[in-house]
């Protein structure tokens, strides 16, 4: 069995464990509506050997108009089983940007009780920069497996929770969007949304936690950045972003820095900013 790791693994580590029987590698790429790319098509064109595609839009709740919301436990279990994931699998997630959406896959595994998961630090760009082997084409079929979820409700927040928190200020809300979006100085990439942020929230753009090569900063530097944003371990933390994807980069950083994972506001600004009845600040 592959030994437990931290929330991040290096390209060297993955290369050494790529052929292990319990290893499952996922490309969890998703692109913004303003980006003229398709994650699944790019995966077929180039991926780490043996990787499968983790479709964030498919492994989601089909009964809401909000993008890639967390599915019910039964749906998640079925889809992960179809992808060949069992409770003994070790899942490594990467994406085509470096570190953007891979953390969403890692976070979902933890949400459903599976801690044998990690993010590939630097993702596909670092793998390719090091001239490691890649392949193209559709992946071969995999044998179905049985995955038993153990849902951790404490790691997820809905809009009702967030409205209550505006009044109570019990939890610190960290917003991973760019500063200009947080301050309503730049439009949202999805049409029809107001600009601004949840009252009382703090801004920590996810890019501030990454080095220039899209690897995550070391724990000591993460702790410094998180402290500047108000994280000292005294209050619970809820992360948010545009659609609940880059919020999980903040979650990943907190775990890497030695803090509890906190919770993610799944609907994030796409839900909050599209409703006329939610308060906001600019």
Language-model region placement:
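Cytosolic catalytic domains that perform sulfur/thiol-centered chemistry
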Residues: 1-282
């Amino acid at each position: 069995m592959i030994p437990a790791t931290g929330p991040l693994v290096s390209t060297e580590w993955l290369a050494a464990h790529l052929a292990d029987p319990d290893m499952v590698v996922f490309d969890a790429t998703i692109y913004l509506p303003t980006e003229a790319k398709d994650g699944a098509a790019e995966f077929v064109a180039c991926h780490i050997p043996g990787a499968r595609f983790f479709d964030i839009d498919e492994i989601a709740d089909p009964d809401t108009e909000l993008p890639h919301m967390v599915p019910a436990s039964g749906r998640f279990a079925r889809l992960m089983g179809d992808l060949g994931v069992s409770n003994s699998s070790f899942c490594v997630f990467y994406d085509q940007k470096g570190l953007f959406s891979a953390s969403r896959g890692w976070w979902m595994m933890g949400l459903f009780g599976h801690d044998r998961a990690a993010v590939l630090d630097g993702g596909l760009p670092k793998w390719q920069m090091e001239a490691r082997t890649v392949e193209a084409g559709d992946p071969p079929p995999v044998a179905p497996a049985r995955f038993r979820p153990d849902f951790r409700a404490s790691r997820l927040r809905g809009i009702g929770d967030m409205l209550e928190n505006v009044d109570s200020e019990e939890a610190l809300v960290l917003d991973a969007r760019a500063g200009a979006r947080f301050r309503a100085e730049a439009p949202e990439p999805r049409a029809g949304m107001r600009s601004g942020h949840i009252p009382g929230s703090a801004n920590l753009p996810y890019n501030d936690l990454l080095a220039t090569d899209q690897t995550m900063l070391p724990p000591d530097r993460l702790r410094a950045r998180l402290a500047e944003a108000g994280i000292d371990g005294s209050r619970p933390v809820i992360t948010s972003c545009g659609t609940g994807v880059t919020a999980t980069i903040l979650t990943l950083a907190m775990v890497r820095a030695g803090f509890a994972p906190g919770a993610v506001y799944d609907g994030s600004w796409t839900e909050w900013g599209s409703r006329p009845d939610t308060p906001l600040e600019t």
